[in-house]
């Protein structure tokens, strides 16, 4: 049975259309008072949700792009850009398309995308706190707010909804909602008290109250080299292996050397592990870097090169390298094999018209004219596993019975002596693992704070 078509909805008072005469007045008043600073960054990336239930994804991608947070992976063509289709780590897109997404899962996505996030439910805050945070985001261009609320409290059709808050008029105590369902409602001003009441409602899917989150740019780009991929449900089994099986394996089996620990971890790696951790190097040959990259891109590649060098200078890397060199390729998942074309060789200008191994995803593609550009999608080497072992929580190894071996392992994975750049990269991976664990256990709506 076909559904009757609709063309937008009329705003009901007390909401005021942003483009109306009064809406413009409210905007000008707020602009004069300095509470529209965040508006311009947001409006530059204002988007319409691509599916009726994608309001949470659209709001988040809009905010991440407005903060110039680099996703570290391509959207389309050569472009790195946040799109709703890329925000799938905490809930499969098909489920979001059908049922929408919870507040906790949007918070999870924001954390996993590398943003700094502060999230509050209405029962964890007050209207005065909310007003203070609205002012904070409205007077700055490096912090934005996403609100989740029940539309019917605002006399609008629909139920739960997400949208960014684009500004605030203090004299009128009104907030600007940049409604991402632009096919339905235009941006509009609403009394802040009414918006609070709309947030102070129960989400029937979780039994928890709605709320708001503050999203800001981290001190540095997250995931310069490594990130976790959750494009399909395989990540569930892999996250379980890393967070549950590895601690059990090292505590239940006799391990008396570091090499034996590595063997126990690697021998049971899920077959699809190479799709779980991806390398975001996007490295090109030296002459191509000099010719076609901006100074910002060159600086980024230099950081990646330094980070890769730091990984390979760790004592743990030397153990991993020795271990993988001592076993045959077919005794381990292929992704763990020692390969010829490690990332450092590409970084130093290794040239070849063909991929030098099957699984490293080294591709030579045509650039301008007949020039070829070497792109490394993800490594299949020792540095990946070194980074992963460093990223596992320290308590992973607490079940090792040999106390001297336990102390040696603790020293190998300790972040204290490592450079700041490597520490930040490892902590980013560790937080991603923790967020995935929360999602796997359906605890993302219980704990909104960033993983420690």
UniProtKB/Swiss-Prot annotation:
It holds the Pfam family Phytochelatin. The keyword Coiled coil applies. Residues 287-315 form a coiled coil. The keyword Kinase does not apply. Keywords: Acyltransferase, Cadmium, Coiled coil, Metal-binding, Transferase. One of its GO terms (biological process) is phytochelatin biosynthetic process. Residues 1-220 form the Peptidase C83 domain. PROSITE patterns: PCS. It catalyses: [Glu(-Cys)](n)-Gly + glutathione + H(+) = [Glu(-Cys)](n+1)-Gly + glycine. Signal peptide: none annotated. Induction: Not induced by cadmium or other heavy metal stress. GO terms for molecular function: glutathione gamma-glutamylcysteinyltransferase activity; metal ion binding. Belongs to the phytochelatin synthase family. This is Glutathione gamma-glutamylcysteinyltransferase 2. It comes from Arabidopsis thaliana (Mouse-ear cress). The gene is PCS2.
């Amino acid at each position: 049975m076909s559904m009757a078509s609709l063309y937008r909805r009329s705003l009901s008072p007390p909401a005021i259309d942003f483009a109306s005469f009064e809406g413009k007045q409210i905007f000008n008043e707020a602009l004069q008072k300095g509470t529209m600073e965040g508006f311009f960054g947001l409006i530059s990336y204002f988007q319409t949700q691509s599916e009726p239930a994608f309001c949470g994804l659209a709001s988040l991608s809009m905010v991440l792009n407005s903060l110039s947070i680099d996703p570290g992976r391509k959207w389309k063509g050569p472009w790195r850009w946040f799109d709703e289709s890329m925000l799938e780590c905490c809930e499969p897109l098909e489920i979001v398309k059908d049922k929408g997404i919870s507040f906790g899962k949007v918070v999870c996505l924001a954390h996993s995308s590398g943003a700094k996030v502060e999230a509050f439910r209405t029962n964890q805050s007050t209207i005065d706190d909310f007003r203070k945070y609205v002012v904070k985001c409205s007077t700055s261009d490096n912090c934005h707010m996403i609100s989740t609320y029940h539309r019917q409290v605002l006399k609008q059709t629909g139920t739960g909804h997400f949208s960014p808050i684009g500004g605030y008029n203090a004299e009128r105590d009104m907030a600007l909602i940049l409604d991402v369902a632009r096919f339905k409602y235009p941006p509009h001003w609403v009394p802040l008290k009414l918006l609070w009441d709309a947030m102070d409602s129960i989400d029937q899917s979780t039994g928890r109250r709605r709320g708001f989150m503050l999203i800001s740019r981290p001190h540095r780009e997250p995931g310069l080299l490594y990130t976790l991929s959750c494009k399909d449900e395989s990540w569930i089994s892999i996250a379980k292996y890393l967070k549950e099986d590895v601690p059990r394996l090292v505590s239940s089996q006799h391990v008396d050397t570091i090499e034996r620990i590595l063997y126990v971890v690697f021998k049971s790696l899920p077959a699809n592990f190479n799709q779980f951790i991806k390398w975001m190097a996007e490295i090109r040959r030296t002459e191509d870097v000099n010719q076609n990259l901006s100074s910002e891109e060159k600086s980024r590649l230099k950081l990646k090169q330094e980070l890769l060098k730091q990984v390979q200078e760790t004592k743990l890397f030397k153990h991993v390298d020795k271990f993988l060199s001592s076993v045959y390729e077919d005794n381990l998942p292929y992704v763990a094999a020692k390969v010829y074309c490690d990332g450092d060789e590409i970084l130093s200008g290794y040239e070849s018209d063909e991929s030098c191994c099957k699984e490293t995803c080294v591709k030579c593609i045509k650039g301008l004219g007949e020039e070829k550009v070497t792109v490394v999608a993800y490594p299949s080497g020792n540095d990946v596993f070194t980074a992963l072992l460093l990223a596992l929580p320290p308590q992973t190894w607490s079940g090792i019975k040999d106390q001297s071996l336990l102390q040696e392992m603790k020293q190998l994975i300790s972040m204290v002596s490592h450079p700041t750049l490597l520490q930040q990269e490892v902590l980013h991976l560790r937080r991603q693992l923790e967020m995935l664990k929360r999602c796997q256990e359906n605890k993302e709506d219980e704990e909104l704070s960033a993983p420690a």
